[in-house]
Amino acid sequence: MKVILVMMAAIMCHLTALAQEDLSADVKPKYVALSFDDGPSLKFTPMMLDVLEENGVKASFFLIGQNINEETAPIIQRMVQMGCDVENHTYSHPNLTQIPDVQILEEVAKTDSLIEAYAGVKPSYLRPPFTAHNAHVAELVGGKIFIAGLSCRDWRADMPVEDRVTMTLDRVEDGRILLFHDTNERTVEAMKTIIPQLKARGYEIVSIPELFRLSGHTPAYHSPKMYGKAY
């Protein structure tokens, strides 16, 4: 009798192990990219970087050229040292669909030059202000991948922290690029909840280039497409 019980226990253990292997094989990794617009802010961007560093995650920062200077240089260098990537959000934040071609080119080129000078990298991505974009802008600019993102409208200064959290977590999905702003304290506070909650839901939080790499999808240059998801 004891022998039978031992054999049955061994069989049960084996079946449980197989079931667990099958279960883990079926679990597909989930990824989401964090991105922040309109910085660097002397006050709030360092606070945001602190939150990212404390949680061990990286993000993509879309910088406005007129905010890039000797005073904000240490913040930009810290982004790079943390493994975050630094991208283009134009020089003065105009609607690119409503300005002359020469100004569009100047807005992008000036910011590219500043980012190269202060971050040591040439931006691959462009997030047009207000995500305003069309085929003409894409053709004119060329050589850039246009990035959109899922926004909780956190640019609104009066928006409660709880609403920023809820609007993000209720709509997040695998492969999403999340769009925030590192220009106000309420978003900094919201990230203290959003990041742990995303991790608890099984998401790995990455920068935008890493999201595309992990998805196996290569985004297109010279394309009118705006990427809000990697796949």
Residue ranges and their predicted role:
Residues 122, 132-133, 137-171, 203-215:
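His/Asp/Glu-enriched short active-site or ligand-binding loop at hydrolase and phosphoryl-transfer sites
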Residues 15-19:
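Sec/Tat signal peptide C-region and signal peptidase I cleavage site
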Residues 21-27, 55, 68-69, 186-231:
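C-terminal domain-boundary segment and adjacent tail
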Residues 5-14:
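Bacterial N-terminal signal peptides
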Residues 20-97, 103-104, 110, 114, ...:
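Active-site beta->alpha N-cap acidic-glycine motif
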Residues 32-35, 59-63, 85-90, 124-127, ...:
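Structural recognition of the beta-strand scaffold that forms the well-ordered cores
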Residues 94-99, 154, 217:
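A short acidic, helix-capping loop that chelates divalent metal ions and anchors anionic groups
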Residues 39-43, 70, 98, 102-105, ...:
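Soluble non-cytosolic domains of exported or imported proteins
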